[in-house]
Design a protein with these regions (language model features):
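Short glycine-enriched nucleophile-adjacent loop
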Residues: 106-118
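A conserved short beta-strand
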Residues: 118-131
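Cap/lid segment of the alpha/beta-hydrolase catalytic domain
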Residues: 1-98, 102-103, 115, 130-131, ...
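Gly/Ala-rich beta-loop-alpha elbow adjacent to hydrolase catalytic centers
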Residues: 101-109, 123
Length: 141
């Protein structure tokens, strides 16, 4: 699974907490660009990981197609596999993994915490898109 990692030079990668970020929707490409909002976490020894999961189009059109509609579960499984892949590579403390996603990434957070509740120590689901039927039926938005 393609990931982008950033961390402070000199940290012990095996013992560092991880903040996983995922979106995986609408073909959006999540660039691995500098985010000053991550500095407080990085200065505290965190690893920040952007997981480039299906539903985004980082790997092309088919990558996007394979993460939408009836294939949406691929997005969720990709994120979980991305997390487990880091653990297998001895990157990060497996007891201190957190996940972050907003809007459609909030839907992702809801899914992963239901599929693998023991894998993540905490979840941040910012403005989650989790009540699809009500949201899509609301004519005011």
């Amino acid at each position: 699974m393609p990931n982008s990692l950033v961390y402070k030079k000199g940290i012990d990668l095996k013992k560092a907490p991880i903040l996983m970020y995922g979106y995986g929707s609408y073909g959006s490409i999540i660039d691995a660009s500098f985010r000053k909002t991550m500095l407080p976490l990085l200065n505290r020894g965190f690893i920040f990981c952007i997981s480039h999961i299906r539903g985004g189009s980082e790997m092309g059109r088919q990558w996007y197609e394979d993460g939408k509609m009836f294939k949406k579960k691929n997005t969720f499984y990709d994120f979980i596999d991305s997390t487990k892949g880091l653990i297998q590579e001895n990157i990060g403390d497996p007891k201190n993994i957190f996940a972050l996603g907003g809007s459609a990434g909030g839907l992702l957070m809801g899914a992963i915490i239901n599929y693998e509740p023991e894998l993540y120590k905490g979840i941040i689901s910012a403005v989650p898109f989790v009540d699809v039927l009500t949201t899509m039926s609301d004519e005011s938005i």
